[in-house]
From Swiss-Prot:
Protein name: NAD(P)H-quinone oxidoreductase subunit 1
Function, as annotated: NDH-1 shuttles electrons from an unknown electron donor, via FMN and iron-sulfur (Fe-S) centers, to quinones in the respiratory and/or the photosynthetic chain. The immediate electron acceptor for the enzyme in this species is believed to be plastoquinone. Couples the redox reaction to proton translocation, and thus conserves the redox energy in a proton gradient.
Compartments where located: Cellular thylakoid membrane
GO biological process: one example: photosynthesis, light reaction
Catalytic activity: a plastoquinone + NADH + (n+1) H(+)(in) = a plastoquinol + NAD(+) + n H(+)(out); a plastoquinone + NADPH + (n+1) H(+)(in) = a plastoquinol + NADP(+) + n H(+)(out)
GO-annotated molecular function: NADH dehydrogenase activity; oxidoreductase activity, acting on NAD(P)H, quinone or similar compound as acceptor; quinone binding
Organism domain of life: Bacteria
Pfam families for the chain: NADHdh (PF00146)
Enzyme Commission numbers on file: 7.1.1.-
Length: 372
């Protein structure tokens, strides 16, 4: 298999060729991936917000953002600047420390989770053997921040929103993890790189979405609930709870919740693309592309082309899913809290357990097709 271009090795080699020591070159490299990750996640959020505004406008037969840049593309930037310059108000009876750490606990795990998202064979920050386990573990931290924010606000609407958020997250975290375990069982690995490689070789027919149709539906429903997207936005239902746990927040603290929600949506779409849609894999095999271009598979320019195509394919798959999530928000009504919990505990949980057991049985019966 073509191993692709190793960005870390190439970057360090370039600096050492300029006369820098190996230790200094590695020290310069270390903060770069995290910086690029934060920049990429922020840009992804800006694109997502712009898509949300334009798609919602199209659904409602409006124009949407139009004046802030061409087609209103700078409107999310203007919204962000507005929030930056707003006054940061802390309610008089709120707990100031918990009020501060609530949004931080919500946002930080989501950004750290981008560590395990691969955009190519070597295009990820770190290839952990337990990457999927790390993502599930980090996603379980956010409800603590939501509950903390609701409790610290000393507001009945905020507290109810925080309690709803915690209940919703716990209810859907388990089916989400069980659906991912079925993929892990087929791939024999918790590494996101190995999961994508397990889907390679057969083009679109090798994607896990065909071998895990039930699992992919469970994952998608649970991911929407984890992101608190309609029809699962019970923690911040405007008609019932004003803004839920966000009611007392303003300025940058509110912006952290806002950014965290969209960063989590983009992350969920990227993880879905990696687990079920082949990640960076595209229909044309690398050896066929090399034959058409008349170059070797190890040619540096071919590696750059395949890396660019891998990034493009991963992002396109993710934003297709985001498009579906946005359409669902503006076309599906909100469920009640009892319906939400019944769906998670009485339907998704048993179905995900049966799906996991069925995957284990199929793995034993058909090891070639199910990763034996």
């Amino acid at each position: 298999m073509n191993q692709g271009i190793d960005l870390q090795e190439s970057f360090i080699k370039s600096l050492t060729d300029l006369g820098l020591s190996g230790g200094l070159a590695k020290a310069i490299w270390m903060p770069l991936p995290m910086f690029l990750m934060i920049i990429a996640a922020t840009v992804g959020v800006l694109v997502c917000v712009w898509l949300e505004r334009k798609i919602s406008a199209a659904v409602q037969q409006r124009i949407g953002p139009e004046y802030a840049g061409p087609l209103g593309v700078l409107q999310p930037v203007a919204d962000g600047l507005k929030l930056v310059f707003k006054e940061d108000v802390v309610p008089a009876k709120a707990d100031p420390w918990l009020f501060l750490f609530g949004p931080i606990l919500v946002v930080m795990p989501v950004f750290v989770s981008y560590l395990i998202v691969p955009f190519g064979q070597n295009l990820l920050i770190t290839d952990l053997n337990v990457g999927i386990f790390l993502w599930i573990s980090l996603s379980s931290i956010a409800p603590i921040g939501l509950l903390m924010a609701g409790y610290a606000s000393n507001n009945k609407y905020s507290l109810l929103g925080g309690l709803r958020a915690a209940a919703q997250s716990i209810s859907y975290e388990i089916p989400l993890a069980l659906s991912v375990l079925a993929i892990v069982m087929m791939s024999n690995s918790l590494s996101t790189i190995d999961i994508v490689e397990q889907q390679s070789g057969y083009g679109i027919l090798g994607w896990n979405i065909w071998r895990q149709p039930v699992g992919f539906l469970i994952f998608w429903i649970a991911a929407l609930a984890e992101c608190e997207r309609l029809p699962f936005d019970l923690p911040e239902a405007e008609e019932e709870l004003v803004a839920g746990y966000q009611t007392e927040y303003a300025g940058m603290k509110f912006a952290l919740f806002y950014v965290g929600s969209y960063v989590n949506l983009v992350l969920s779409a990227l993880v879905f693309a990696v687990l079920y849609l082949g990640g960076w894999e595209f229909p044309i095999p690398v050896n066929a592309l090399a034959g058409w271009l008349g170059v070797s598979e190890t040619n540096p320019w071919l590696q750059i082309i395949t890396a660019s195509l891998g990034i493009t394919m991963t992002v396109l798959k993710a934003y297709f899913l985001i498009f579906i999530a946005i359409l669902l928000r503006w076309t599906v009504p909100r469920v009640r809290i009892d319906q939400l919990l019944d769906l998670g505990w009485k339907f998704l949980l048993p179905v995900s357990l049966v799906n996991l057991l069925l995957t284990a049985a199929l793995k034993l019966a058909f090891p070639f097709a199910f990763g034996g």
